[in-house]
Amino acid sequence: MSRPSSRRAFLKHSLVAGAATWTAASWSRVYGANSRLKIASVGTGGKGWSDLTATAASPQVEVTALCDIDESKNFLGQAAEKYPQAQRFTDWRRLFEHKKAFDAVIVSTPDHMHAPISLPAMQLGKHVQCQKPLTHTVFEARQMRLAAKKYNVVTQMGNQIQSHEAYRTAVKLVHDGTIGKVKEVHSWQSGPVGWRLVDDRPAGSQPIPETLHWDDWLGVAPTRPYLPKIYHSFNWRNWRDFSNGQLGDFGCHILDPVFMALKLTAPLTIKAEAPAMNNDVWTKWATVAYEFPGTELTAGKTIKVTWYDGDDRYPAREGLGLPESYKLPASGSVLIGELGQVGNSPCGDAQTFSPENFAEFKIPIVPYARSLASRGPTLAAVKTRRRLLSTTPDH
């Protein structure tokens, strides 16, 4: 197990010093016609497993390195069994010492370790697919953007839903002026996905399993005792030290098409309502009202986008203009336009509402947009450095 002081000092230095502390690999290297992209995966369980297996399904890819702080069956164990030819590591820093062993990195760790791993990878000239949310803080996101541009690497944030037909169809409906200028937007996530909300940090500790490198799991976060099923492997999303809460977990999926559809930039004002919070956990619910500068697609000089999260929390139906027969999905958005509404959700198809305007309207279907968000860094993208969906500089 790594020494906490040396590890955190190293990570702090690499994050703050940024691009100045590493030397990028040269782009003079040219991949041959039959070359395969060598992939290293940091984080091999949960979402890391699906990212890894989806990427490895491409004949253009060879999995050459696996890294996870958990050596048990459901993490590094299963990955090593499926890809026995790959080198194995429990410390990403040791992996990065073998920089000739891989061309690109998949980073599928808890949120707080996204930037501390992705930044050094880019500084080594490695292409990076990093899971959403891109970083734990705004400062880290800005550093990631600078590094991606400086080292001219292919990057992607792993918000796979951005590629789905429903999302891109909803964007097209707005861009085509189908519902007129948009007046307001309501977006929601009615409870966490796959993890349970808690009130406070439990007391006590338990022995650390031999297969778990707990100190390396904590990474840049403050030290805390190990408790099974409280942090690792999935419930870390409750904790401010490790995640960005419900808004960070699913806002990147649900608000993404809103930003794309309306071409939004930075908000002018943000007003949040939530129960009292402490230094450990995220609140169980929140309502966040954003006011953005208007665009050519909005009805006014500004537009209000309201976010709702928490168990069974939805926008009030009054004022949405939706038919009574329409049941709000567990997560999604309603964009209210001058001529009607567009409903969009990761749970289903894009829809339009306003019987008098859309009685015979047929919704166009935008084909599924395959990208690095769905299949990992492709050899063609690495060769040409072509622009992909959801790049690190974009986010």
Q: Where in the sequence are the language-model features?
A:
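Structural recognition of the beta-strand scaffold that forms the well-ordered cores
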Residues: K38-V42, V63-C67, I106-V107, Q129-C130, ...
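Glycine-enriched catalytic-core subsegment of oxygenase/oxidase enzymes
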Residues: A54, T64-C67, E71-E81, F250, ...
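Secondary-structure transition/capping motifs at alpha-helix termini
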Residues: S58, A147-V153, D176-G180, L262-A266, ...
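A structural signal for well-ordered alpha-helical segments within the folded catalytic domains
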Residues: A115, L119, R142, H164-R168, ...
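A contiguous active-site-proximal alpha/beta segment in oxidoreductase catalytic domains
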Residues: H127-Q129, T135-T211, D216
